[in-house]
Amino acid sequence: MSQIKALEGAEIALVAMGESQLDFHLAKSHSKKWTEVWGINAMAGITDCDRVFMMDPASRFLDSDAAGSQTGIMVDVVKSHPGPIYTCQLDERCPGLVEYPLLDVVKATKCSYFNNTIPFAIAFALYNKVAKLNLFGIDFTYKGNLHFAEAGRSCVEFWLAKCIENGMVVSVAPRSGLLDTDVPIQEKLYGYHRLEDPTLILIDEDEEFFNMGFKEYSRLMEEKQKADGEVVMTVNTPPEAKRY
């Protein structure tokens, strides 16, 4: 499969089933738009997705209940979604399935480290030269299998590092623990977090890094709040009308 020209320079929302998917729905309610929305597995049954990544064979959902409570919604997805649904094997019962371009992606990225579905989607974005990738619902908070959660998160963060090194802008839902996004800003840098005035690393409007003390940062945020007359939000809240 050749690279998709329409994706070069695109901004993508990649949405999975974790709790921080809420940030995706809230962003939509605030009129946020993306070039395309890509869904992981059952998310395609919840919101409109331009592309779906389902790296299990469709038989896992059609011929067994191994996926638990997601089985029913996945049966609906694989039978009704027009595609493309990228997967590892075609199935005549599912017209929207497309074989994932595994060899093309591996050759282009020089890596074959894929231990769950999400890295396949991230690598696909890298392969197609996506400019900005926004991640929602990718939290790896599985309580029943901590090893799977830790291994999956590390693989995802590895691929995000490759994307960042290649110039892609990566954004993570504020409720997600991915890349320590939900860690308080004054606790993100180990060691420095123990100082009386913890050091922060920030990014300016020109996407250049700079450092600042937490006390100065807090003062500036307080001044901005007073000047703007509103709370500076880091997490979207339900939208409200200007006039009632």
Residues covered by each model-derived region:
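Metal-ion/cofactor- or nucleotide/acyl-coenzyme-handling active-site neighborhoods
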Residues: 1-244
